[in-house]
């Protein structure tokens, strides 16, 4: 069965990503012609929610529909019916029946970045420190893709990979690391991206760092539609800034755990190491002998990548 993974609006176009009946990925820019309903005096087979006679009006574009609604805004004797959320209208028109989503087709990418932080805590707003590694794993692949700046031998990996493999991309500098990552990403756009606190750290840090190093053109390549939207949210009195990579859904594991992991109760810490132990009985690979992650990076790059 066909289904969608993302539907966005850009001007008079619908930006559609999904899968067809054969499980083939679809990326389509569609000129959508919405419908609204206006009152009529004559008897009509079409009725409003309140039983009023209405007629269907199809517009050439979403912009035309918006202009029409604006003309009658505040007119008590001429009420326009139908949804002006044209994304919802598009989805309803395309999928009039229940949608069967096939999880086996959906490409979910788990990713994580590491940042050099030898003289302070890196903040995504400033993105002042270099990105020194990026790792990702697609649900459609058994291979971890890792970009780093030092030597790494996957055959010496200390972590139980449970049959998965590691493809390591050694880079000579941060600029090369970001360029190679963007090159891979733009050829393998996922449907969903996830990580631990990825919405308010990994993604905004990466967006802002790429903007500093390479410019807006390369930032836009993070989206299959070459569009990045800023999203602000106030959490515990503090404004957090995230970015929507248009065409890719975000499912932050930290947010999901706080929302759906209530059976574990309140936690003393929401760091990944602690939650991993609470849920799975496993901690992250220990590097306490090095004191800090930055010292580990400097002294044992092999274990740092692990």
What do the PLM-derived regions correspond to, one by one?
Residues 1-306:
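The two-metal-ion catalytic cores of nucleic-acid processing enzymes
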